[in-house]
Curated annotation (Swiss-Prot):
Catalyzes the transfer of the gamma-phosphate of ATP to D-galactose to form alpha-D-galactose-1-phosphate (Gal-1-P). Its main location: cytoplasm. Belongs to the GHMP kinase family. GalK subfamily. This is Galactokinase. Substrate binds at E34, H35, T36, D37, Y223. Its EC number is 2.7.1.6. The record marks R28 as: Transition state stabilizer. It comes from Salmonella dublin (strain CT_02021853). One of its GO terms (molecular function) is magnesium ion binding. It is an enzyme of class 2 (transferase). Keywords: ATP-binding, Carbohydrate metabolism, Cytoplasm, Galactose metabolism, Kinase, Magnesium, Metal-binding, Nucleotide-binding, Transferase. ATP binds at G124, A125, G126, L127, S128, S129, S130.
């Protein structure tokens, strides 16, 4: 039974009438462009075929009833006429409540909804299960009540909910790719203008995500430190963001900067340039050049931004040794654990899976999780 069938069956069973709509919003993986989003730079993610699915129907009153199928059918119920506050014990509820609260501030021409939610985006793997949930909930209200909101507005609404209601800092990339993703394409996103250009993926290439299953511990504190270091760099150049600094300008005065800040700045500037070039390499089907850019990106994250860990570097080395120059691999996500992403010809996937299975656990003592994904469509009815 797929997620649509599961949520529709549960909806009818619990609410006693059939759902009118089923909405999905995908998770994502970022192919290249790491820690560039909050520097107003470029990212190149694609939506993946793991998603949050919501079966739903409008109500004729002002109540929102939500069932979380993946949390033992826990229930949340709240009114649109009372102030929406955080739920004491159910963290998942706060993503739903936050999205609805921020939607009210944008366009409150909507009424109550019944919904049943289920998803298969792996949690804690850095594949944006939370953004997928936020975009799915926003799309439910937009579709049921014909709200005049586009994908970018639904994405911004989800980001606001996560930053201000849930209380977790994030850039805009995760929500934007979930809302705007396009089947068989990646999206080159300008994080300053929110402009997005669809970039076709070469045929016969698999998007492979391998979770190191190394538990991230430093990610919050170190993430904030990196942001501060980038802001320090932008102030040094008297620019609003590192997006506005050229590599030439940086190289001319790099020695005057604090050495650690200089390394952080160099990563962001070089990563932005790599990301823009990667989009054109993908479009041309030049997997060899894409692989070189991904390798440079990983080295920059390891040596200049210092956000990789030995387990991740080991995974990258195993994959690279298997594929040679027929594709690319790098860490993806915030760092300090999490996943690597690889672009690999489909016929090489079994060899990569076998090499990782034979070597990774032997070298690290941890068993990996292996996902083979397809670049998928963004949020909408399913």
């Amino acid at each position: 039974m797929n997620l649509k069938e599961k949520t529709r069956a549960l909806f009818a069973e619990i609410f006693g009438y059939p759902a009118t709509h089923t909405i999905q919003a995908p998770g994502r993986v970022n192919l290249i462009g790491e820690h560039t989003d909050y520097n107003d730079g470029f990212v190149l993610p694609c939506a993946i075929d793991y998603q949050t699915v919501i079966s739903c129907a409008p109500r004729d009153d002002r109540t929102v009833r939500v069932i979380a199928a993946d949390y033992d059918n826990q229930v949340d119920e709240f009114s649109l006429d009372a102030p929406i506050v955080t739920h004491d014990s159910q963290q998942w509820s706060n993503y739903v409540r936050g999205v609805v609260k921020h939607l009210q501030q944008r366009n409150n021409a909507f009424g109550g909804v019944d919904m049943v939610i289920s998803g298969n985006v792996p949690q804690g793997a850095g594949l944006s299960s939370s953004a997928s949930l936020e975009v799915a909930v926003g799309t439910v209200f937009q579709q049921l009540y014909h709200l005049p909101l586009d994908g970018a507005q639904i994405a911004l609404n989800g980001q606001e909910a996560e930053n201000q209601f849930v209380g977790c800092n994030c850039g805009i990339m995760d929500q934007l790719i979930s809302a705007l993703g396009k089947k068989d394409h990646a999206l080159l996103i300008d994080c300053r203008t929110l402009g997005a250009k669809a970039v076709s993926m070469p045929k016969g290439v698999a998007v492979v995500i391998i979770n190191s299953n190394f538990k991230r511990t430093l990610v919050g504190s170190e993430y904030n430190t990196r942001r501060e270091q980038c802001e320090t760099g932008a102030r040094f150049f008297q620019q609003p963001a590192l997006r506005d600094v050229s590599l030439e300008a940086f190289n001319a005065v790099a020695s005057e900067l604090d050495p650690v800040v200089a390394k952080r700045v160099r990563h962001v500037l070089s990563e932005n340039a790599r990301t823009v070039e990667a989009a054109s390499a993908l479009e041309k089907g030049d997997l060899q050049r894409m692989g070189q850019l991904m390798a440079e990106s990983h080295a920059s994250m390891r040596d200049d931004f210092e956000i990789t860990v030995p387990q991740i570097d080991t995974l990258v080395d195993i994959v690279k040794a298997t594929i040679g120059d027929q594709g690319g691999v790098r860490m993806t996500g915030g760092g300090f654990g999490g996943c690597v992403v690889a672009l690999i010809p489909e016929d090489l996937v079994p060899a990569v899976q076998q090499a990782v299975a034979q070597q990774y656990e032997a070298k690290t003592g941890i068993k990996e999780t292996f996902y083979v994904c397809k670049p998928s469509q963004g949020a909408g009815q399913c």
